[in-house]
Amino acid sequence: MFNFANVYQQIAQHPQLQLWLNTLPQQLTDWQAKQHGDLDRWMRNLKKIPVGQPEVIDLKNAVAAHNHQPLAQGEQKKLEAVLKTFHPWRKGPYHLHGIHIDTEWRSDWKWDRLLPHISPLKNRLVLDVGCGNGYHMWRMLGEGAQQVFGIDPSELFLIQFEAVRKLLGDDQRVHLLPLGIEQMPELNAFDTVFSMGVLYHRRSPLDHLLQLKNQLVAGGELILETLVVEGDEHTVLVPFDRYAQMRNVYFFPSALALKVWLEKTGFVDVRIVDENITSLGEQRTTEWMTHNSLPDYVDPQDPSKTIEGYPAPRRAILIAKKP
């Protein structure tokens, strides 16, 4: 069983978040009561990871921690074996006590692309929607965020996050909650909201943009990252079935069309700050994620297309303000 008491304590310290306490405890109680497949096994393995206070932590340039005296080889091997029971590791990388968790995604590359364009996170209250295992939340903390909350319904991501948290000294300035944004009240409370890799999974993308706006304070900033296609402000791809072997995908606008969507839902100062074709080096199979990955999803004869014949993955980052 997870103990979310620390989450409630952190929320209570922010008056603008206290409305959340009207619904969150019951939601998490209901979540705990459900059967979650491998969760019991993962929880048993999570308990094998000791909580320690690393002598060196770097969240500014990476997500890394170590002591001046390295772990004994046997202890390091035991820890690595436990961490590998939480396979697949999709978002990272992590460098923890001599163990390099080489994840499917080089999430640090995305962070490097967006960081020069966003408002400084120092002392900000931040929400990361669809946060995965929390890699970017640690990087937000490294930029000085006061408190970071992430939401993602995946049990495995929660386990991976809690494993990393233990190895980073049990830092309580960042929390991952197993929720979707549709379960959140309209808090109008966060200085910065991130939504990265979520929009194309939404049947109603404009509703998702409105949900994001309803979490921001007036003047707050949205960082939106999603799959896009080339084209003008009228261009939108709706895959017939799968896209790069993904089933649950719906709308792929051009970056210009997405800018129009943001303006239509009431955002201002909308900027397209980056467009990038995902390289085979940024998303690939590794020792820590042994399933198929991007190289298996693009046409081997023409890597500019997916195996279904659609344009290969292109991702855009847009930044917008809530008036």
UniProtKB/Swiss-Prot annotation:
Keyword vocabulary terms for this entry: Transferase, tRNA processing
Catalysed transformations (reactions): carboxy-S-adenosyl-L-methionine + 5-hydroxyuridine(34) in tRNA = 5-carboxymethoxyuridine(34) in tRNA + S-adenosyl-L-homocysteine + H(+)
Enzyme class: transferase
Top-level division of the source organism's lineage: Bacteria
Pfam families membership: Methyltransf_9
One of the record's GO molecular function terms: transferase activity, transferring alkyl or aryl (other than methyl) groups
Residues annotated to bind carboxy-S-adenosyl-L-methionine: K91, W105, K110, G130, D152, P153, S154, I181, E182, M196, Y200, R315
EC number: 2.5.1.-
One BP term from GO: tRNA wobble uridine modification
Membrane spanning residue stretches: none
Purpose of the protein: Catalyzes carboxymethyl transfer from carboxy-S-adenosyl-L-methionine (Cx-SAM) to 5-hydroxyuridine (ho5U) to form 5-carboxymethoxyuridine (cmo5U) at position 34 in tRNAs.
Similarity section: Belongs to the class I-like SAM-binding methyltransferase superfamily. CmoB family.
Subunit structure, interactors included: Homotetramer.
Name of the protein described by the UniProt record: tRNA U34 carboxymethyltransferase
Gene that produces this protein: cmoB
